[in-house]
Amino acid sequence: MTPIAVTPVAPVDIIYDLKHTERATESSPVTLLDVFSRAVSQYPNHELSFITSSAHDSTIHTKTFAEFNQDVHALAQAMRAWGKPTGSVIVVYLTEHEDNMAAVWASLLAGYVPCLQPALSAQQAHKEGHVGHIKNLFSSATWLTNESGAEQVQSISGLDIHLLSELKASAEAGVDFQAHQPNSDDEAILFLTSGSTGFSKAVVHTHRTILAACHAKGESYGLTSESKIMNWVGFDHVAGSLEMHIAPLLYGASQLHVHASAILSDPLRFLHLIEEKSIQLAFAPNFLLAKLTRDLEKRSDLFGKFDLSSIKRINSGGEAVVSSTAQAFARTLKNLAKDGDASFVISAGFGMTETCAGCIYDPINVLETPPSYEFLELGTPVAGCEMRVVNPEDGVTPRPDGESGELQVRGPMVFVRYYNNPEATSSSFVEGGWYRTGDVGIVEQGKMRLSGRIKDTVIVHGVSYGIPELETYLQTVEGVTHSFLAAAPYRAPGQETEGFVVFYSPTFDLDSEDAPAKLFATHRALRDVSVKLITLPPQQIIPIPINQMEKTTLGKLSRARLVNLFKQGELAKHIDRAEELVSIARGASFVAPSTETEKTLAGIYAGIFNLSVGDMSASENFFELGGTSIDVIRLKREGESAFDLPEIPTIQILKHPVISSLAKYVDSLISKDASQEEYDPIVPLQLTGNKTPIFMVHPGVGEVLIFVNLAKYFQNERPFYALRARGFEPGHPFFTTMDEMVSSYAAAIKRTQAHGPYAIAGYSYGGVVAFEVAKRLEAMGDEVKFTGLINIPPHIADRMHEIDWTGGMLNLSYFLGLVSKQDANDLAPSMRPLTRKEQLEIVWKLSPPERLVELQLTPEKLDHWVDIAGSLIECGKTYEPASSVSVLDVFYAIPLRGSKEDWLNNQLKPWAGYSRAEPSYTDVPGQHYTLMDFDHVPGFQKIFRSRLEARGL
C-alpha cells in the first residue's frame, strides 16, 4: 500500500488568492472588514437574530445587518477614545452572542485585536493564575466585559477593565468615523486554547487565514445569500464565531444565534427553531443528537408535526459521532417531519482552534448510505486543506493507506503562530508546514476517521478537560495510594460519548475484612470528585494492587499501557474482584424490585441514567444517582405514560425519590386511594453524608425545583432539605402571616434535625424567612452556625406593597420563563384593566409551548400558582426585621434594578444591624434570577460550600 496525503479536488488558487492584493474587490474581500462592509452594503435587510442566556427571556431579538452596522460603528468610535495603540489586544469576556459579536467587530473597526475569553474557572486560584498569565502574555491587560465579568476579575491587580454597558452609554450613533484599514496578514482575532495541559495558548488567526477557511467552508456548505443558519456554540469558540458567523456573513446569509442553555435545557426547541426560522444549516454535537433522540424517538404524539423541509445539513463536531446515534437521530427526524419522504444530511467533521474550526467533512444521508464503522467517517478536506497520517515517533514518515498514525493538516486556514510563544509554535509544525493535531487517525480510500488522541485530554460534551488536572484531584481521595493513580480517556464500543477509566492502587488490602466497605467508599468518592470537576463519573474504576502497578523508569504510570491491558482483558480479574467487593458492600442494602410498579420505575430510572436494570435496587434514590431538575421532568413524563396516569405531581417525586417509596405513591394513584397528605414543608432533595444538613427556604414563588441542581453537589457530604410553601396541594390553605410560616418551618426543621448546630439559607424572599427561622431556633436554645441570605435585603415591605396581582403574575411568569423581562416590565399598565382570565390568556399566548409542556402547566395551575405567590407577598407587606442572629452570610448577584455596587452598599449591608458578628458579603456570578441556573450553579455551589466551611460546617 502506498503512503498518501489527501488534497482537495478543487485547486486552491481559484478559491482564494490574496498574495498580491491588499484591498478588496467586489468579488474577493481581503480582510474581515471588507466582508462586513460588503454584507451591509449588499444585504442591509438580512438579519442577525439572538436568543439570550436568560431562562426568563425566550424571545428572539433581531437586528438587520444595517442596524447592527450602526451599532458597532458607534461602539468602535467610543473604543477609539480609550487611546490604545493600533494593534492592541482587547480581551473580550462577555456572555451573550450579540454582545460578543458587537465587541469583536467594534474592536476590528477601531484597529484593535480582539481575544475571545471563554468562561473563567470558578476556582479562585485557577482563575487568578489564568488571568495573570493572559496579562503577562499580552504585556497589557485591557478587558471588555460586563458587570458580572468585572466582579470575577476584580481581585487581579493591573487590569484595565472597561464595561460594555458604559461603552454603549458613551457611544454616539451617526458620528463620522474612519474605520481602521488592516492588511490581509495582520492579526485579526485571537482564540484561547482550553489550557487542558497547562496555561492557555493564544492562537493567532490573520484576516488571510480566516477568510481562506470561510471561503472553503461556504463552498462545502453550499452557502448563498438566501441561506439561513442556526448556531448555539459560544462565540468564544471558533465554530461559533468563524464557522457559524463570519463564513455565513461572507455570503450574506441570515443568522440565528442561540445561547447554549436555551437548547440544552430544552432540546425540543432545536426543532422548533428550525421550523420557525426555516433554518438550512445547523450544528449539533454527538451528545445533543443522542439527547434529542432519547427525548423524541418515542414521542409518537409529535410524529408528523414538524415542517423540517428547510434543513439541508446538520454539522456535528467537537467529539466523535456514533454511527448508530446519527442513524437513530435521522430516523427520529423522519418520523417527526410532516414530509414522510424527507431526508437528512448529517456531516461529521474535524477541526480545531488552530484550523479555524472544521476543515474536514463528510456530509452523508446516513439512512440511504449506512455508515461502515462504529463512528462516522470525517471525510475529506475542504478546498485548500491537505491531510496526512504519519508515524507519531518521527512525525514525518507517512503511514500506508488504512493504517493509523498521527494526523497532520496544512493549508491557508491553519493558524500562523501562538501569540508570544515561539517554542510552542515551532513544536507544533514539522517540515513542509504540516501542523501536528495531536490526534490519531486513519485515512482509507481518501476518507479520514479518528481512532484516538495523543494528547492527555478527555472530551465531555465537546469540552476538553485535562487528564493531569483530573488526576491531581483524584489523588486526594482517601483510599488512593499517592502517585499510584492514572486516568485515561476511553470510549466503549457502541458508547455515544467519550468517557474515562480510573486505575489506582488502594491503600488497604483487598483481602481484608473491611475491604468491601473501604472500596465502596473510595469508589464513591472518586465518582463524586469526577462529577464535581468535569460533570462525568468514570466508566470504570479498577483497583490494582501496588505490587502489580508498573511504573516507567521515570517513575510514571503509563496510561497507554493500562488502557491496552484493559482493552485486552488483562485486568478482568481486578474488575471482577472490585465488583465482588462492591456487591458485598451493597448486599445489606440491595433490595430487588418486587412489585410490578417497582420494576417499571427501576426500568425508567435505569434508562434515565444509562444503567443496567439488574443493578437497580428498590432502595435507589433518584437524586443520589445524579438526577437533575430536567431529569425530574423526564421521570414525571415517562411515569405518567407508563402507568397511564393524568399526572404524577412533581412535588411527590421530590418527596419520594426512592423507587420503593415512589412506587407506593404511584400505586395509590392507580387505585385512586391517594388520601390527602398532611402538609409538610420539608422536601428532602438528597440525604447522604454526615455533615450538618442544609435547610434551604423557597424563593417568592414558593416552589423548590430550582434547588434540585444545587442539591446534587452535596451528595455524600451533607443532607440537603428544601422548604416548600403551603398551598400547592388541594386542601392546603395558604399562609396568612409571616409568623405562621416561620412557626411551621421551624417546627418542621426540628422534626427533621432535633438539635443544632443548624445551617439555614434562603433564596430571595426566602432569605428573610430563613433569618426569622434562625431567630426562632436560637430562641429555643439551639445553635445556628450558618444563616445564608441569597440576594435579598432586610427591608422588603416597600417592595411587597409595589406588587399587585398583575405585577405578581408577570413576575412569576418571567421567573418561570414564560415571558421576557421586557414583556414583564412593559405589559402591566395595559393589562391591569383586564380581568384575571384575560390577563392569563395574554401570558398563555406569549408562553413558549415547550416550556408549558416542561412545567406541565395549565391556565388553572398558573392561576393558582399566582395566588400562592400572592399569599407570600401579603405575608411580607407588614414585615420589618428586628433583633439579631449570631452571624449572617450574605450572597449577592446582579440585582433586578440598579448597579451591583449600590445594591451591596445601600440595600444589603444594613444586614449588619441584625447580626451579632460581622456578616460576610460574598459575590456570586449571575443575575438575581439566574444565579442558580444551568450555567451558574457549578460556580455557586463552590462559593456556597466555602462559606459553610468557613463557619466550621
Curated annotation (Swiss-Prot):
One Pfam family, short name: AMP-binding
EC number(s) per entry: 2.3.1.-
Domain of life of the native organism: Eukaryota
Thermal dependence of function as given in the entry: Optimum temperature is 20 degrees Celsius.
GO molecular function: acid-thiol ligase activity; transferase activity
Domain Carrier: 592-670
Pathway info: Secondary metabolite biosynthesis
Biological processes, Gene Ontology terms: biosynthetic process
Gene3D superfamilies referenced in this protein's UniProt entry, alphabetically: 3.30.300.30, ACP-like, alpha/beta hydrolase, N-terminal domain of ligase-like
Top EC class for this record: transferase
Listed SMART domains: PKS_TE
Region (Adenylation (A) domain): 38-460
Protein name as catalogued: Atromentin synthetase invA2
Record lineage: Eukaryota, Fungi, Dikarya, Basidiomycota, Agaricomycotina
